[in-house]
């Protein structure tokens, strides 16, 4: 990620953080994000309006999970207000990185994200989607180190550590629910594996063999793969 992009994200994170501070000072404990799209029913290329209940559509995605380490202990230690500030800085920074890599946020969990790359409706090829997901994970950690944690440290707030997991594979998209309560869900082994790698990772990106095999090759590449259990840790090459 270029220094210019890092600086752009730094400004966005700072705005989100200061907005959260202003909210606290006014004692308005409420969510302040405005989004152009609802995360639910957000599988790329699929809509609840056009799918039938029990539908079975097959697609392929690179799947990324990022999750905060020791988030429960951290929240208990620093308290609700500092957790509130931390999450506004963290989520805004992560969403900017996802956007820069053409990812689609499928879910915002309490302390992390699930993101899809590629698919039938995406302009990205299979290999491009795989590379985008892996590089997104690396850049997420870079933004945490270089943007978010310095901001938190300035206010004596416990720094954030995250793990990232990435896999690629078949995904089944289906519409689940009843007539007035329903959602579009993605199901697949690659989702489970990406989540598993995320749980194992600490301040690193762990990817599957499928990601390793599909990664575009180039001489003097900037990324190398280090074997870890049944996956690989993405590391800087050169």
Q: Where do the PLM segments sit?
A:
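Catalytic beta-strand-to-alpha-helix segment of the class III nucleotidyl cyclase homology domain
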Residues: 120-237
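Intrinsically disordered, glycine/charged-rich C-terminal tails and inter-domain linkers
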Residues: 1-46, 202-238
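Charged, low-complexity, helix/coiled-coil-prone segments
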Residues: 17-43, 71-91, 131-145
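Short gly/ser/thr-rich secondary-structure transition/capping motifs
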Residues: 43-48, 147-149
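Short, functional N-terminal and low-complexity linear motifs
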Residues: 38-41, 59-63, 104-109, 160-165, ...
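Catalytic NTP-binding/metal-coordinating core of nucleotidyl cyclase/transferase enzymes
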Residues: 50-132
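Short low-complexity stretches enriched in small and charged residues
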Residues: 14-24, 40, 68-73, 120-125, ...
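Short acidic/polar alpha-helix capping motifs at helix-coil junctions
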Residues: 12-18, 34-36, 56-63, 157-160
